[in-house]
Each structure stands twice: as structure tokens, then as C-alpha cells.
């Protein structure tokens, strides 16, 4: 490579590394109430997109593969969103999160990983227009949601 190209690549890399560090610092400075609001919004949106699929699975609405595929795609993305909002600085904020979510972060993260994996299965089945696969995967998503809420969410 030309010398100027090497310098350009190194400079770009340095900017990216510095930018990543600034991004991490910025997240660490987000106010706890904002993090709680972010995770609550992500959970509410998951419910919004899961609800119509659930209605179809129960027979309360006709099965629509296009709606399932769209909603499952949203769910795949939303399933990854709330977790960076569950940090120790938010433990004193008003929310339904049980203290165990912060005391055993590895176990809590495993529950989050399970939800992400199950929504990925749902998304794959939905994009393949595989109704039987969607039904099976929906059960996995519902179970992952329920078990995490049972363990880490206060009852209303």
C-alpha cells in the first residue's frame, strides 16, 4: 500500500476506536430514569407486535403470514433492545424489576439471550411462511417471556 493510504487507514481506525470509547462513556452517563424508560418502551413495543401473532395462534384472528413476518422481524430487533437499560444504577428507580435481576446478572442475561434466540426462530419461521414453525416458535417466545417475567418482574 502507498504510504498515504496506510496513514489514512490508521487515522480512520483511530477515529473509530475513539468513537467507540466515547459511545461507551455516553451510555454510562445516561440518567437511570432514561434507561428505565427505554427498557419499558422496548417491552411495551414487544407486546404490541407479539399481540397480533398471539391472537392468530389462539384463532381469535385469521392467520396472515405477511403480518406475522413483519411483526416477527420487529420482535427480533426489539428483543435485543431493553437489556442495556438494566444496569445497577437503575435498581433504585421506580419499575417492576425485581432486585434479583441485578443480583444475578449472569442468570438474567441468560434469560435475555433465550428470548433473543426464540425470537430469531420465530422470525426465521415467519419469513419462510412456515405456519407450523411459527406456531412452535411462538410457544418458545411466550415461554421465554413468561419465565423471565416470573423470575424478574414484580406482580402488578
Regions found by a protein language model. Give the residues of each.
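Bacterial N-terminal signal peptides that target proteins for export
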Residues: 3-13
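Sequence context surrounding c-type heme c attachment/ligation sites in exported
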Residues: 33-67, 71-156
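Sec/Tat signal peptide C-region and signal peptidase I cleavage site
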Residues: 4, 22-28
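Signal peptide-directed secreted proteins
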Residues: 1-4, 156
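Bacterial N-terminal signal peptides
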Residues: 12-21
Amino acid at each position: 500500500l502507498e504510504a498515504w493510504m496506510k496513514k489514512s487507514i490508521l487515522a480512520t481506525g483511530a477515529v473509530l476506536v475513539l468513537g467507540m470509547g466515547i459511545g461507551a462513556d455516553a451510555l454510562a452517563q445516561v440518567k437511570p430514569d432514561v434507561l428505565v424508560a427505554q427498557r419499558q418502551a422496548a417491552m411495551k413495543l414487544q407486546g404490541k407486535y407479539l399481540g397480533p401473532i398471539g391472537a392468530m395462534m389462539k384463532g381469535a384472528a385469521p392467520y396472515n403470514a405477511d403480518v406475522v413476518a413483519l411483526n416477527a422481524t420487529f420482535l427480533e430487533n426489539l428483543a435485543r433492545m431493553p437489556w442495556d437499560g438494566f444496569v445497577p444504577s437503575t435498581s433504585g428507580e421506580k419499575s417492576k424489576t425485581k432486585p434479583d435481576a441485578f443480583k444475578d446478572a449472569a442468570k438474567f442475561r441468560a434469560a435475555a439471550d433465550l428470548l433473543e434466540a426464540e425470537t430469531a426462530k420465530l422470525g426465521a419461521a415467519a419469513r419462510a411462511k412456515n405456519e407450523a414453525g411459527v406456531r412452535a416458535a411462538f410457544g418458545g417466545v411466550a415461554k421465554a417471556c413468561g419465565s423471565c417475567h416470573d423470575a424478574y418482574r414484580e406482580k402488578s
